[in-house]
Each structure stands twice: as C-alpha cells, then as structure tokens.
A protein has these predicted regions:
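Iron-sulfur-cluster electron-transfer modules
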Residues: 2-131
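Short loop-to-beta-strand transition segments
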Residues: 10, 65, 216-226
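Short amphipathic, charge-patterned alpha-helical segments
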Residues: 52-56, 203-218
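Hydrophobic alpha-helical positions that pack around
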Residues: 77-203, 215-218
C-alpha cells in the first residue's frame, strides 16, 4: 500500500458488525511535482482500477466508493468516467451486482487541484465540500473518515494491483521483489534517457536495471545524481 503499509492490514482496521456506512476512496490526486505514474495507468487500463475498487469495497462492506482526481487532467477524467459507465452497463456496478446481493455506487469526484489534497484526510475534507485541510489523528480514517464513517483511502497503484493478486494468489505476489519489500511497483523515468516513461518492475530493482529498461542514458549525457 501507500508508504509501504500493508493494504490487507489497513482494510482489517475497518470495524466489524458496526452497522455503519463504510466508504472506499481512491486517491488519484497525483500532486507531487514530477510524479506521473497514476495518469498513464488510468489511461492505459482504467477497468483494472474499477475492478480493484469493487473487490476492496466488497471486502470492507462499502456500498459507496469514490475516485478523487485532479481537475487539470481532463483527458484522464474522460477516460475513467467512460470506464465507470461501461462497468454500470455491464452490471459490475449498481444494485445487486451480478445477482449476488451486493450494491456499489462509484462516483468520480473532480478536485480543484490543491496540492494539500494529496494527503488523505485533507482529501476527505474536500470530498465533503470543505477546504482541504489535514485532520488531527487519531481517530484515523478507518474509524472516522468520510462523513465520520469508517473509510479506506488507497492510492491508484495499490487498488489496481488487487485484481492480479486475487487472480494469481498471494504467494505469487510475495515471490516478487525482496524479502522485506515484496511485489512490484511503477517507476517513472524522465530526463536524458532514451525511452522515458513508466515501467512496472519488482521492488528492489537496481538503478542500473531501471536505466536499462529505459534504454540507457542518451548520447552526450552522463548520470549526475539519483
């Protein structure tokens, strides 16, 4: 999960048998300067993100989910909104999904682009219609999040990884990466490399290997710092 915190443990913090509304929120507010991994992921395959949201919402018993996205990325907003509409038409969202008795409404919320809304509690304030400001913790969102109800906030990459783990099993995922950092992640390379872009690779990959994925340093340039 985000910052390396185990996602399963985070989902497990949601109270059981509390008879309260639960919420599942995806933080797609990619606001760090130079960060550009969520945008290409959502453009390439928004459906895998929606599938992860459905699985996560079912796991924490949430019937309402949100994707919070920056207003500047109009092309991504259009792409994700179309994918949501496709999912509704296919019966993967809405009432009584696939006849299984599970309801899920998914809303794409377009933010105003405030940098601070990348922080999860400021994002929740913004979703509620207030100015985004970080909240004092505790309580944490899993106990009192959106509308003071139990809420999970995950980033795009985390949620999009869920379907492949469900399909292939936790042992498959744990076999990737290193002993202390299992799995894979997205790396963004820019600057003077031959093939700048985003690369999915195991955690623990070396800088040399990442540069090789990007085709190496361009002629006439040297690696100055990392």
């Amino acid at each position: 999960g985000g910052a390396g915190f185990p996602t399963g443990m985070k989902w497990g913090f949601i109270p059981q048998g509390d008879n309260k509304e639960h919420y599942f929120v995806v933080n797609a507010d990619e606001s760090e300067p130079g960060t550009c991994k969520d945008t290409p992921l959502m453009m390439a395959n928004p459906h895998v993100l929606i599938e992860g949201i459905i699985i996560g919402s079912y796991a924490i018993r949430a019937n309402h989910a949100f994707i919070y996205i920056r207003g500047e990325v109009a092309h991504v907003i259009s792409r994700v909104q179309q994918a949501i509409e496709d999912a509704y038409k296919a019966g993967y969202l809405g009432k009584n999904i696939l006849g299984k008795g599970f309801d899920l409404e998914l809303v794409l919320h377009v933010g105003a682009g405030a940098y601070i809304c990348g922080e999860e509690t400021a994002l929740l304030d913004s979703l509620e219609g207030f100015r985004g400001q970080p909240r004092l913790r505790p309580p944490f969102p899993a106990i009192a999040g959106l509308y003071a109800r139990p809420t999970i906030v995950n980033n795009v990459e985390t949620v999009a990884s869920v379907p492949s783990i469900i399909e292939n099993g936790p042992e498959w995922f744990a076999a990737i990466g290193t002993e202390k950092s299992k799995g894979y992640t997205l790396y963004s390379l820019s600057g003077h490399v031959n093939n700048p872009g985003q690369f999915e690779a195991p955690l623990g990959i070396t800088l040399r290997e990442i540069l090789e994925l990007a085709g190496g340093i361009r002629d006439g340039h040297k690696l100055k710092f990392w």
